[in-house]
Amino acid sequence: MVTTDGDDLISLIYDDGTMETLLIADDKFKSSPSIVKSGDDYVIMAGSYDDNMHAVSSTGEVVFTVDTGDHVNSSASFINLNGAVYAFFGSDNGMLYAVDMDGGDLNGWPQNIGESIDNSVSFADLDGDGSPEAIVGVSGQLYAYHMDGTMYTHFPVSYEFSFTSAPLISDLDQDGDLELVVGSAGSLVSIDIMESGSIEGYWSQDRSDNQKTGFYEVVESECSSPMLGDVNCDTLIDVLDILMMVNTIINESDTTDYQGWASDLNQDGIIDILDVLNIVHLIIN
């Protein structure tokens, strides 16, 4: 999937080299397309210098268009909120948007940052409350918003140079909280949040993943309120979850996708004694 700044196209290039044009905009594209898959449906989003964020299907049908009032240089980033997918993106007039897959605004959005937004948004649950935050660097300020549009505590964070990348969010030092790593015009910046958080299942870096695919797939979960440590999905983290984890470790029992994710507290791909120690620590504290 590509966008062009000469012919103003969103195009699909097949593996045999043939190309299909999905949309012709009224001005050039300067950002990469982002793709979300839900069920069998694909939506491709790309912002143009015709002042619109365009969303089209894989067959070229216009899904929706958001008139931003200025050029769109940032690529869309996706988040799943209670089964509904939202796209976050900015425009050159300083507006940060959050829209559903019909183009409707998320409650509390857009937010007026006031300066041109060229970078894309990353997501993480910074404080471990089960609700993600949206993080974006604009000029020399790093912003973090709750999903209702309110600002996260201690943000924005100021820096002497302009931020030039989407945040990469990870627990770099394996201490249970998250670090925000952001490129700037003068250096690489790391900000320690110092609250227990999670990036699991979130678009937590530029273009979604290490391969920079810009692809997001909505995966149905058997648990309506997924939470690391809540292995039996009863909204509590307690001794019953420990027993299930120990049974899995000792007996090498099969787990569902959700149980495997919820049991792997340190997200190292292995369910072991370290995860048990982590859940005991959570319960005690």
Residue ranges and their predicted role:
Residues 1-222:
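Extracytoplasmic/lumenal domain signature
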Residues 220-285:
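Cellulosome-associated attachment modules in secreted, modular CAZymes
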